Amino acid sequence: MGALTKAEMAERLYEELGLNKREAKELVELFFEEIRHALEDNEQVKLSGFGNFDLRDKRQRPGRNPKTGEEIPITARRVVTFRPGQKLKARVEAYAGTKP
């Protein structure tokens, strides 16, 4: 199973929408830049029919070095989470098991 890259997304926009390659690449970059800016500003990103990007604060917690067994603290941090929307879930589930 491969991965869809930003370059491939730009190529698809070029092929399907008739944008030139530079415009397609800029469009993809701007899309992700808007998501980054919103998250940096503590905003939730809601993409209708796709899902939501949220920020979550995690508290410090105890951890363990797997090699030595030594206890080490895992520092508090903010993480980005993604929750797929119902439409995306339904489409993915509809194709489950149809491709190797």
From Swiss-Prot:
Belongs to the bacterial histone-like protein family. It comes from the Bacteria. Signal peptide: none annotated. It comes from Pseudomonas entomophila (strain L48). One of its GO terms (cellular component) is cytosol. HAMAP family: IHF_alpha. Pfam families: Bac_DNA_binding. InterPro entries: Hist_DNA-bd (IPR000119), Histone-like_DNA-bd_CS (IPR020816), IHF-like_DNA-bd_dom_sf (IPR010992), IHF_alpha (IPR005684). Coiled coil: none annotated. Keywords: DNA recombination, DNA-binding, Transcription, Transcription regulation, Translation regulation. The keyword Membrane does not apply. This is Integration host factor subunit alpha. PROSITE patterns: HISTONE_LIKE (PS00045). GO terms for biological process: DNA recombination; positive regulation of metabolic process; regulation of DNA-templated transcription; regulation of translation. CDD domains: IHF_A (cd13835).
